[in-house]
């Protein structure tokens, strides 16, 4: 297991690339979403490995990038800080310029990154991203529910028949193989409490409502925003509205998919990515 220290946290990372390749390839970095890990990007990365060296990593507090007590409380869970974590990761791996693909919360991190470090990105894919309006009552209810979801997590959930399917139902239009659904549930149960709760408040907040439209409007890097037609987490309309704020953003919607279009309809997703980045 490869790890690299970023601001006191041992971050898990892995390379997905063709083992027999001797020719240097451009690097594509994948950023996962809330409660997940780099694991769900592995099949997408493997499919792109002919044209890219793919770098996957677990965000601070998620997956295999565990937060130790010695640094807990020293770092915030603002998404801008996660963007800075990514910059430090690239520095340590001596990567000057990359392609970037972020999903959900990871897409918000990627958006902050390309505006803070535009010179470090060739092109970016934002998978399931968008902007939303502030509703005080709805947000308060969401925080309360989110707090319960994060607080009451037990490993015995993994032993409950079909728990993984129930957990993933809201995220999907098309079902996924059981081993993938179980991996999602495992990652959710593994997430650090403070990180999981903290990023709920920074991802869905009055500040995010005000800041994210400005961030989309500032985009100068060539960007593809991919939405799932039936996404209930970040509805396609929110992605369409976000894309309209910058002429550098191309919008693409995948039919009959929800919050994980790269897994629900991999052929369509991969073909669009390849067309966008200019590979066969």
Outline where the language-model segments fall.
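Alpha/beta-hydrolase fold catalytic core
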Residues: 1-29, 49-52, 91, 95-96, ...
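Conserved alpha/beta-hydrolase catalytic His-Asp/Glu region
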Residues: 136-137, 156-217
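Flexible "cap/lid" loop of the alpha/beta hydrolase fold
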Residues: 115, 123-155
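Conserved HGGG/HGGXW glycine-rich cap/lid loop of the alpha/beta-hydrolase fold
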Residues: 15-68
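Active-site loop/oxyanion-hole signature of alpha/beta-hydrolase fold enzymes
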Residues: 56-101, 105, 271
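Catalytic histidine-centered segment of alpha/beta-hydrolase-like enzymes
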Residues: 257-270
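Short beta-strand/loop motif that positions the catalytic acidic residue
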Residues: 219, 225-227
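Acidic catalytic loop of the alpha/beta-hydrolase fold
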Residues: 230-234
């Amino acid at each position: 297991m490869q790890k690299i220290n970023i601001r006191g946290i041992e971050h898990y990372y892995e390379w997905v690339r063709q083992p027999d390749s001797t020719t240097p390839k451009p690097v594509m970095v994948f950023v996962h979403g809330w409660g997940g890990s780099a694991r769900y990007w592995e099949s997408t990365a493997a499919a792109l490995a002919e044209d890219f060296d793919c770098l996957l990593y677990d965000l601070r507090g998620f997956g295999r990038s565990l937060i130790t007590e010695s640094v807990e409380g020293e770092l915030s869970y603002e998404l801008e800080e996660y963007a800075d974590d990514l910059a430090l990761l690239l520095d340590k791996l001596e990567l000057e310029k990359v392609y970037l693909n972020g999903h959900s919360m990871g897409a918000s991190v990627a958006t902050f990154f390309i505006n803070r470090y535009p010179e470090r990105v060739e092109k970016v894919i934002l998978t399931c991203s968008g902007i939303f309006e502030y509703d005080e009552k709805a947000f308060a209810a969401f925080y309360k529910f989110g707090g319960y979801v994060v607080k009451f997590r037990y490993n015995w959930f993994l032993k409950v028949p079909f728990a993984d399917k129930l957990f993933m139902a809201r995220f999907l239009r098309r079902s996924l193989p059981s081993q993938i659904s179980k991996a999602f549930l495992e990652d959710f149960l593994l997430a650090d409490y403070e990180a999981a709760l903290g990023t709920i408040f920074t991802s869905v907040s009055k500040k995010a409502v005000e800041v994210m439209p400005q961030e989309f409007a500032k985009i100068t890097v060539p960007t593809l925003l991919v939405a799932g037609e039936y996404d209930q987490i970040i509805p396609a309309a929110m992605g369409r509205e976000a894309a309209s704020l910058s002429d550098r953003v191309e919008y693409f919607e995948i039919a009959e998919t929800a919050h994980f279009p790269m897994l629900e309809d991999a052929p369509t997703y991969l073909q669009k990515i390849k067309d966008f980045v200019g590979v066969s």
